[in-house]
Amino acid sequence: MHLRDLTGPEQLKRLAPAELAQLAAEIRRVILETVATNGGHLAPNLGVVELTLALHIVFDSPRDKILWDVSHQSYVHKLLTGRLHQFHTLRQFGGIAGFTDPRESVHDHFHWGHASTSISAAVGMAKARDLAGDDYEVVAVIGDGALTGGMAYEALDHAGHDKTKVIVVLNDNSMSIAPNVGGISNYLARIRTGPSYQRVKHDVAEALRQIPLIGPQALELADRLKEGVKHLLVHNMFFEDLGFTYLGPVDGHNVSALVDVLRQARAYPGPTVVHVVTTKGKGVPYAEQLPDKFHGGGPFDVATGRTGPGSLTYSEVFGNVMCKLAAEDPRVCAITAAMPSGTGLSRFARQFPDRYFDVGIAEQHAVTFAAGLAKGGMRPVFAVYSTFLQRAYDQVIHDVALQNLPVTLAIDRGGLVEDGATHQGVFDVAYLRAIPNMVVMAPKDENELQHMLYTALCHDGPAALRYPRGKAQGVPLDETLQPLPIGRGEVMQEGADVALIGLGTMARVCQEAARLLAEKSISAMVINPRFVKPLDAELLLRAGREVGAVVTVEEACLAGGFGSAVLELYAAHGVNARVERMGIPDEFVDHGQPARYLERYGLTPEGVAQRAEALLLRMRSDLAAQPARRSRSVRRLSGAKAAGNGET
């Protein structure tokens, strides 16, 4: 059977092993070609082809609920559930998502993109099933990397104690995003490669195969008994101690073996863990060799895996400056939550291994760990995607800001990204500026980024700087770094008619918008505020009082954002300026090219210029109407006085 002939996952149950192997090869080809064109998560999906086939053979989706942790590895699932003909639109504006999305299919149950959540949701769905008297299965598919997140253990502890019937499929590829770290990774490795267990398993199998006539039957019987043997040879069975039945490890690229073990799990009455060992990037040599690089990213050459040359990214600039500062100051440390490459810290990890800490997918721990480092006299920098910092908000407030500790939050992917609602970095400005003691910065370009990082490390308190994903602007980089005055912005150009205030990279957009306005004889002041908190009150108040027409522009949510901060400042000082706020409205932003969304929200030079013109037009219209309004008010007031005097 070809993939194009597949109308639903129920057809998989009737396919022979050879047909399944052919289908697996075709699925890998489709995924490779699509991701090479559109970008996306290549290696994780290549590694789960056979596992996904087996899941849909054993379980009856959508009645049985298959939940994909993070769900970046759900491409195969999408192809098997009727989305082949839309698959070429993967991650494109108006196309299908790179993660599960219930709006797309009844086979998708959550709109996910963060790690370690699937077991909690599965336990909740299973409990709802039991309360309703239903009997469908609930399966959580989670990677070994996601098991470094504490939330997964909270759910395992709950399910094991409660004996809720739920199946947890542990996809163990020893990687997740980057090479896994920590005790759990080492524990799983011992299960996979423990010499006692593996040696006995091999020797027994070989001996049984040699028995004439009954060898195969004896081997099958031994397979059924091996769980008991495993208890004797692998000590401290973690999952068993939590109350789960443990099955595995199983070859994650053997469909028949996977089907057998999943059927066993389905037959168990209580919670079960199925340990599946896979190869990330399976079937594509360059993805197998460099699974970290091909975890997720942009387009590449399908034959070689190479990407085109280009200028430095903001992440790379950040990483280079971190190395420079660490060489000068032995107190500088770097922390990542399983994203060394994505955050630009790979070089730092090589040069300063003693001051580099990958804590796994554990953002809460990362922030409080940074607080401990700072309390001990170090200058820690936690490099984290904006969307993932949300997971550690309490720790930022309670363990860092309340203690007023010198922890730097280097917030990558601040703004719009291709991956959609689960990954948009648009909330950080609003939630960080509400925190006392916190300094919040946004650079207009990569040169300002390096000065802001130095500023944060010189500051004796918590500081955050947010910068976007992707290529930097290509401006020259200063050799000598200088700390910026805290709370001081920059006037990029003076103007008399309207003030354009662009946060971060929007400052450059405002500068170009000012040029467009100048062509229409409109004089625009352009301000790079640099600081969300503390604001440059003197500069912003001058713009409000002297210019009167103000447009704030931010690649962040409007609710509680930078524009709101400016309005609060004006209200507190009685400044009667007309303020037009531009940014992300009160909605979740879907997947697609950020440029398309910037255009939709008017966050382009043309869009900003148009809003500024419209604001000035309204102000002129209001000014022209003021004499008429005043005369109507006088007439109404005169009439009221006349009525009070008995006049008619």
Curated annotation (Swiss-Prot):
GO cellular component, one term: cytosol
Manner of cofactor binding, per the entry note: Binds 1 Mg(2+) ion per subunit. Binds 1 thiamine pyrophosphate per subunit.
Annotated metabolic or biological route of this protein: Metabolic intermediate biosynthesis; 1-deoxy-D-xylulose 5-phosphate biosynthesis; 1-deoxy-D-xylulose 5-phosphate from D-glyceraldehyde 3-phosphate and pyruvate: step 1/1
PROSITE patterns: TRANSKETOLASE_1
Catalyses which reaction(s): D-glyceraldehyde 3-phosphate + pyruvate + H(+) = 1-deoxy-D-xylulose 5-phosphate + CO2
The enzyme's E.C. designation: 2.2.1.7
Enzyme class: transferase
Keyword Iron-sulfur: no
Cofactor(s), names only, from the UniProt record: Mg(2+); thiamine diphosphate
One GO process term, biological-process aspect: 1-deoxy-D-xylulose 5-phosphate biosynthetic process
Entry's Gene Ontology molecular function annotations: 1-deoxy-D-xylulose-5-phosphate synthase activity; magnesium ion binding; thiamine pyrophosphate binding
Main function: Catalyzes the acyloin condensation reaction between C atoms 2 and 3 of pyruvate and glyceraldehyde 3-phosphate to yield 1-deoxy-D-xylulose-5-phosphate (DXP).
Similarity-based family: Belongs to the transketolase family. DXPS subfamily.
Assembly and interaction partners: Homodimer.
Protein name: 1-deoxy-D-xylulose-5-phosphate synthase
Organism in which the protein naturally occurs: Symbiobacterium thermophilum (strain DSM 24528 / JCM 14929 / IAM 14863 / T)
Lineage, opening ranks: Bacteria, Bacillati, Bacillota, Clostridia, Eubacteriales
UniProt gene name: dxs
